[in-house]
Amino acid sequence: MYIKLSNLFQRLQNLAKRSRTATKPRSLILLILLFVLSLSIPLVAHQVSALSIIVQTQQNPLQLVEQAKKLYTTGQFEQAALVWQKTAEGFAAQGDNLNQAMALSNLSLTQQQLGKWAEAKQAIATSLKLLEIQEKTPTQRLIQAQTLDIQGQLQLAVGRSQIALKTWQQAADIYKNIGNKHKFIQSQINQAQAMQELGLYRRACEILLESLELEHQDLDISKQQLQTLTEKFSGTGDLASLQVLGLRSLGDVLRVIGNSEQSQLILAESVKLAKQFGDSQNLAAGYFSLGNTVLSLGNQKAQIETISTPITFTSSPDCMARANNTVSELYQQAAACYHQAELSTDANINAKAKLNLLSLLIETQQWSEISTLLPKIQSQLDKLPMSHGAIYAQINLAQNLICLKSAVNPEVSQLSSPLLQQCGVSQEKTTNTGGNTLQPTLIPAWEDIAKIVTTARNQAQVLQDNQAQAYALGYLGGVYQEIGEIPNAQRFTQEALQLVSAFDAPHIAYRWQWQLGRLRRIQENQQGAIAAYTAAVETLKSLRKDLTVINPDIQYTFRDSVAPVYREFVDLLLQANNSNQTNLKQARDAIEALQLAELDDYFRDACIEAKPQQIDRVVDKATPAAAVLYTITLPDRLELILKLPGQENLEHYTTTVTQAQLKDNLTQLIERLNDKTRFAGEIQELSQQTYDWLIKPAQSKLVDSKVKTLVFVLDGLLRNIPMAVLYDRASQEYLVQKYALVITPGLQLISPRPLANVRLNAMLAGMSEQRSFPDENQLFSNLKFVPNELGKIQKQVPNNEKLLDQYFLKATLQEHLANAKYTIVHLATHGEFNSDPEKTFIATWDHLIKIKDLDKLLRSGKTNQPISIELLVLSACKTATGDSRATLGLAGVAVRAGARSTLASLWSVNDESTSELMGEFYSELVNANGRKNVSKAEALQQAQLALLNNRDRNKKWERPYYWAPFVLVGNWL
């Protein structure tokens, strides 16, 4: 329990008077509030909640304790340490081991503030030894747990995160055993800090939700739950700081795992409560965290918005993002948050806020603000005591300076250090060409950056912080690579890898393996480079469960931090002098791994858990004959790998086309395809060029192998194009007229088997009337032909259930799916595929079902196992316009739903033509059920050809707009 100090002192004075009249001295107990501790976790301002210690003393030592406390709270740590030392010596002279231990714990805490890690370690070790020999009373156990809390902070501060986690777990066990709920919650929050440092973000999120007593599913928290939590703790003074801290920690974790909107909601509540309670330190830390989240929202929006004007900071908004904010507004709001955090008297928060603000200013090229801020940062870093966090702050400054050089001189070679790759996003976000007004003296030399990193490395050596040392060594390698001293660059990089091999840190290892691969390419050591890239790719595979651990201290982007590793590896393997069957198969595996990693990044989760089968085996056994075409886009060319049926060797083709040329062609083609007024000739004008790039090189091999089904593993913008529309000018045929077509997100299939062997049982649902969802800013037009569409399917699949309009409720659909095993789930309703999973949805009458909820909807009620859905059909969906990653949403739906095959539309189509196409498709499926030689892919092909061959001039269904958008994903059999 907590006791007010004013009441406590009076009670102790009374006890002291009585003790002087006693025949034997008695041990007296004093509760002293330990102080809010700052955890130095890179670029995330975390706090360990207030700790209490118990001290027992007579009048004079009591005065020393009060004096030490006042010195500590006013930041006079040197003097406070001296007083705590005297207090400990006084207790030792009295033989009062319990209070001596408490004084030593406080001494350790104070020495940590001074960066005197050896002395702090000695003090806490002595304290724990003294506590071990005391009688195991509840009081002793409480003191021991609190001392362990202080030891955990010390361990975390010097980079011993795993040990700190174990220490705090021990403390939590004690608090639980003695029934101290509040302290138990505090220790859970502390554990979450260590978990974040270790990259265990999902575990951290789970323990924080548990500590805040929030029920959750898949780490989602509702607004109602947050409101209930706020009301529950409202006005509870003892728990106020704990609640603020817990919410902030939770908000930080939610941001890292990809739930930025929820993160903002929770962090805003944390800031609100800190203001309410007058907690200035937690308020500053809350603004810092909120700035990080608003920046993350801006970065997400920047990936899908075209920024045509320079980003300028012209106003001073509050730092709360809103749904309709532009990228520029979000960045300004993030800057406003950082400015609020800069007001903190806490040196750690102040420094981190300045560093993240600098990063944002560099990304948006705010030269005058950079000129003002940059000189302040190093002086601020000089105020930090040496610690794990201070080391990472120096490294972060180095990264910012690297990005500053890159922004001033954006020429970045593919063989530059990956450190420059981290800055790639800034050059696409900004078009600020108003002139570089940055003072030349503020543009750092590489040698100056090397000095900063060397300082960080030396400090890491002093602390014996191997993780920070490995990080710093790798950075030194990258800096020397840019200087041009390749031998030194390789030496430092290999030293970093040697050091990291002694402990489990794949998020560090892969970066330096990647860097080593680039260095060896510079030296034309091709085999050595392949070995390094192979190691990097294997390390990334081990990180599948949590790719966000890769770079939590610097804004993480999959495009800049992960995807280039795979692309460069394939580039290396497929160079003319390297191309052989071993390399071709390795390149194909790398393409598949990239596809899988992109989906993991999309969900911020390793979402594919089913046991996959090699497509090769399916291809070789498939009837009719099928082939698989793998694509990967590289800066100067398009690489194609072809797997033909019955052939062990892979075919390899290279098409010389730059990324810019490919993007221009595909972007124009997408625009024309989405315009129903476009004539077929206008589409063919562009799609024949795409055909020549993708299909023509392999055309003769496909003919010779009598291929009837073509399976695509597509890369980048190619995923946004329906392959059916590619046009062969020689034969004057679309690709769909030659082959049945299917897309797969890699070598993964979910237990493929022919539909002909399955008894069809359909769940049919749709929405035909106009519906509005104001909270989601969505208005859906009516789909008057949906009843006709569902009616046609009912005739073909008599064993069915139907939910239409007001009967198509989320709960009703879930109930039906839980109580029956359907082989087909057909949803004729609005939906959208978006690069943001939170904006990828399927509409029911009363809900927008988000993609992350879809798999829960498609699970049986009792076993919670995926239903064996053979086919999921989404017949009225669309892809977000201009969003290059949007079709990941389609692949994500296919994977997340657990369906063997998914049929969906890439853009909204006239629902009358859709009704016609779906009728034809199901007619073919029913025939397939009686004829084993008709696959789902062939059924779709025949349905599309039915529209393509329709010559009704009034309907114009022969135009690609009507028949082309439907794509089959997954199992084509």
Regions found by a protein language model. Give the residues of each.
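An often Trp-containing, charged/polar helix-loop segment at the C-terminal end
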Residues: 24, 343, 914-973
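Residue signature of alpha-solenoid helical repeat architecture, marking inter-repeat boundaries
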Residues: 58-59, 78, 98, 142, ...
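TPR/TPR-like alpha-solenoid signature
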Residues: 58, 65, 85, 98, ...
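Catalytic-core domains of enzymes
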Residues: 621-622, 717-824, 839-844
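Catalytic cores of nucleophile-dependent amide-cleaving enzymes
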Residues: 743-747, 752, 823-920
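Alpha-helical solenoid repeat scaffolds used for protein-protein interaction
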Residues: 201, 205, 209, 213-225, ...
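N-terminal leader/linker segments that initiate helical-solenoid repeat arrays
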Residues: 37-106, 142
